[in-house]
């Protein structure tokens, strides 16, 4: 009888130890899932320079940034423009807006197209002298 009691106690101990391992395993699995979820949350895609700039621009400036993007078609020209100081970019976009506002009338599309080429050439020399070197001929032709 003593042997049966001892064997029974050993059986219960073994059974109890198996259950405790299952609990640890499930806790470990849930911990791993939680860690994976946290890693996914922290691995957001970084924003591009253009997206970061767009957050700081007004609607008019965003419109003229799109216009400028179509003007700067060369390899890396637009990226180079995005590398300039934010205040200089805003100043350039405001200058573009004021010059394009002057282009009205019958041949305004041609004037805007010509101004696009002027802007492209003016930005080739940098943004510092952009406002003085990029002028449209719109008002002079009216």
Curated annotation (Swiss-Prot):
Cross-referenced InterPro entries: Mlp
Signal peptide: 1-17
Alphabetical UniProt keywords: Cell outer membrane, Lipoprotein, Membrane, Palmitate, Plasmid, Signal
Name of the protein described by the UniProt record: Lipoprotein MlpI
Family listed: Belongs to the Multicopy lipoprotein (Mlp) family.
Primary location: membrane
Coiled-coil regions listed in the entry: none
Annotated membrane topology: Lipid-anchor
Residue numbers spanned by region Disordered: 22-54
Organism encoding this protein: Borreliella burgdorferi (strain ATCC 35210 / DSM 4680 / CIP 102532 / B31)
Location(s) in or outside the cell: Cell outer membrane
Induction description: Weakly induced when grown at 35 degrees Celsius.
Positions of N-palmitoyl cysteine lipidation: 18
Cellular component, GO annotation: cell outer membrane
Biological role stated in the UniProt entry: An outer membrane protein that may participate in pathogenesis. Some human Lyme disease patients have antibodies against this protein. The Mlp proteins probably undergo intragenic recombination, generating new alleles.
Lipid tethering residues (S-diacylglycerol cysteine): 18
Basic and acidic residues composition bias: residue spans: 33-54
Name of the encoding gene: mlpI
Keyword Lipid biosynthesis: no
